[in-house]
Amino acid sequence: MKKHSKKILAVFAMVLALACVLTACAPAAASSGNTGSKASEAPASSKADEKPVTLKYIDYGAKPDSGNCDGIWKAVNEILLRDLNCTMDVEYLGSGDASQMALKYAGNEEFDFAYMARWWGFADNAQNNAFRALTMDELKQYAPYMVENLPDIAWQQASVNGQIFMLPNIIFEYNEGIVAYRGDLLEKYEMEKLKTMDDLDRFMETVAKNETGMEVLSADFVGELWVNYPYHLKGTTWAYDYTDADHPEMVCIAMADCYLPYAKKMREYYEKGIFSAELISDTTNGRDRFKNGLCAVTAHNSTTISNIALEVQKSHPEWKIEIFNPYMGNKVVLGAFTGNGFVVTRTSQNPTKVIEVVNHIYDSADLQKLLNFGVEGVDYEMKDGKMTMIADVPADKKMNIGCNWNMSNNLIKETFIEEERYEGYSEIRADFEKNTVSHPLQAFTFDKTAVETEVANMTAVEKEYNAIRYGLLEDVDTAVAEYRAALKSAGYDKVKAEYDRQVKEFMATYNK
């Protein structure tokens, strides 16, 4: 019996060996260096016998003229070639001009994918057939990590007219504005720390009366602080009340009841010297003005303000920067997942490979480190699994690939980095998380096709009356009345009716 068993085993071994020869058994795939999630495994389409694919990518803005840009992309391509048998050929648009990017799509230029954002013409380009629509079946097959980790609202926000067109960023962030101000001036005038908008007004009036050679307030996020947040409005020109999910409606802020009090407040700021007459034409953004000591107060989203405060703390510790949220306890909504993302172009010859690449950018710790922080040993060091940034990296070796806003995944980054936040930020963030609500219109995208002329006319009117935002018009009541009349003449009623129609249709199919 034992002899027969040995013969059988010998024959079986020969069969296995022959099978391996005939099928050219390949060795196991190399490690991808990712987080180890099964979602990060390369899909079946990435086979060893495929020819390597080069994917053309268009990035926002100009290519950096300093730093290790080419070196970073070379390292990225080594990982992509190893894991997905492809590389990226990165072209920088050269500017942040959305119309320049739209021309590339309109001209049928062949490239595979590109940076995109909801504020950078996403909906318009999608409606103009610039992008390839993505199906959920494709996403489940080629982007399993993204499907697993993004909420349904992200894919709804990435959709236009019921079709998914964007691969959204995996960032759970808030866009609500908070305030940074000069703590040294607060001490100088023996004032208590600021907690409310009234406190902020008193501080700014004091600075305006007593400080020379310094503007008080930059124009960034002024509308948000004095209109959007107190009235729970999400949006810029058109917005919705995000605390009232039972009555979804898009309203034109300039036509809303809150606009006249806001306009009068801006005039008050101008008359009290909080706004200068030159502010309307100043091309320096408020963040840089604050960092350079040109203004005493600035506002922006919470993450940006924290980073500004950290930077100024190092460059000017004597300014004793303070940050605060004047609307602690207010309801908030998460920032759009489509604030930054990727789109697959209509002309792409390798759409599913693009989806794989974007999924891998998000699921790989190696790629997250490269694309957001640079090269280990040059830009940062790892100790006990945590990242520490290296100071004084030579300019030619420093991490700098320009726009990488769409390449960050908070879920992965949190596993190896503890991001430094300014004092007070954690309490503000915790308050946001405690008071987060959702609203159906977070996923609504307006199609302006039927009212394109009227929308353009209204935009021209808004620019014409931009001085209201800076308090430059003395008779505010008359100015606002004229502004609203001009909006009416430009086609406001038709645009409003189109918004109402589309919102009604959207709500009829929402979550159906």
Predicted regions and their residues:
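Extracytoplasmic/secretory soluble proteins
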Residues: 2-3, 12-13, 21-512
